[in-house]
Every structure is written in C-alpha cells, then in structure tokens.
Amino acid sequence: MRPLDQCQSIDEAWVAVLQAAHHEAHGRLLHVVVAIDAPGPPMPELVALNDELLQQSGHHCVDRVASTVFPSSSYADPGLTFDPDMPAESLAILDSAEQDLYSRYRTMLPQLQTFDGNSHGTYFGRLVSWPGKDGDGYNQLEVRVRQLRGRRRRKWSSTNAADMTTDDPVWSGGLREYDAQDERPFGFPCLVHIDISVVNNRLSLLAVYRNWYLIEKAYGNLIGLTRLHHFLAQQTGYELGELMVHATVADAQQHAITKVAVAALLDRANEQLAARPGRETAANGVAVTRELSSSSHGRIPAGTSR
C-alpha cells in the first residue's frame, strides 16, 4: 500500500498521486491511498491544463467526467443547510431541491445510457436508481440522506452539540457502485464503493476505485466526489469532513498519453500550485456547493460511465 501525505485540496491530491505514479517504472502504483482535509472547488488553471491534454488525446473533458459522479447542472442549490430546528418552509425548499435532482436524473437516465460509454449505466445513476439500469431502481442516496437526518434529529433532541458523539462516536454506511454478481471480465465500473462515515459531527467520504486513470479520469472524479460530499453535508447538516480515495491501481497512462506529455503536465501543474494564492474553504456544504455547481441548471448532464 502507498499512503500519500495528507493533502489540503483536491488539486494537491491529484498532482501528488500522478507524480508518484509517474516516477514508477511502468507508471502505475498499487493500493494508493490519498486523503484531502478540505475538499473544495478545483483550480481553474489545473482544469484547463488537464482539459488541454484530454482534448489532444481524444478524451472527455474534466467537467464531463465530474458530472458522472455528481451532476451539478441538475441541482438547483437552494442556499440552505439542513438543521433539525429549521422552519418548515425552509425544509420544504431544501427537500424540493433534493427531490428535483433525483427525479430529473432518473427521468434522463434511459437517454443518458444511449451516450458513448454509458451502456451499463452511470455512477450517479447507480446512486439514485440502483442498479442503474433504468430510472425505477433503489435510491441509495435518498435513503442515506434520510438516515443521516434522522441521526441528527435524535442526537439534537437528546444531547447538546458538544456531546453528540459521546454515546455513539461513529456512524457509517455505504453507497454501492458495483454488483458483486457482475461477472463481466471488462467494462466494470472503476468506482466500486463510496463509504460514508460520521465522526465527531464531521461527515467523511471514502471512495474505492479498482482502476484509477490519472490523466483521463482522476481529477474529474475528485471534483465529482467533492460535489457529492458537499451535497451530503448540505442536505444532512453535518460538518464537512475528510475525503479519501483508495485506488487498487493508479495509472499515469504513460503508454496511452506518453511519458513526455505526462511529465510536461506535471511541470506546469506544479508551477500553478506553487503560484496559487490562499484559497478559502467552507465549514459546511453551502458556500462551496454554490461554487462547485454549474449555473446552467436543468441541462442534460453529459458523462461517461467510468
């Protein structure tokens, strides 16, 4: 296993994993673990760098990859965070935004599956309509939100905020992305599981990838996971915790992209990281969810299944 240093941002995390893999003889790492303290919006400069290389190699852009994990274009952020004592009118607005996201995506899922690479479904489709074959499946994400809200309500009514974790310090639950009975030798979803844990009132995510393609997918994956993370924090009222990714194999794609091109990308990315100004992060989901979300709500979220 290769645990990397704790990162402050998804930008640092992406560059750190790519750099570590690039320095390996074959450009691949086994069992990489990277953690981000404060997952927030990506650096536009790094998105542009990644997009430039993706366009040259004929791959989907970063935002399209991110939309497969969380389609921000389909979520009309209400600018509210769940609280057990929030007014009924505000709760109704928050609930409406959540339900609109689910219904909009589930309605579009059959059409999305006709797009290139989506024949076996999309990541977000499996979250809101398991197993993701159509729009009538089991909504894992909605169930987890309701469970977490119920947890917040019970703790709020029985203890004060300072004592919330005294009786039961850890609550965890997962979101499935992979069917264990799926015997396809190829075409597996690379993202197989998302674990949700609450410790000390902080909601953290762990995403498990079988194969993590560091040029083609990883940065977009991190952006999408961050959007999902902030959505969960906003809809449940928990503080934003750590985002962690465990990749069975992390691949710098030096054979497909070329080692020279990856090295050039890393040089430019490290320059951008070194030159960036201080970047603020939000204590909960609201501020960053707005920045992470697209302004064009309602359009079909393009994406591929991996």
State the predicted function of each range.
Residues 1-306:
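Terminal, non-catalytic protein-protein interaction segments that mediate quaternary/complex assembly
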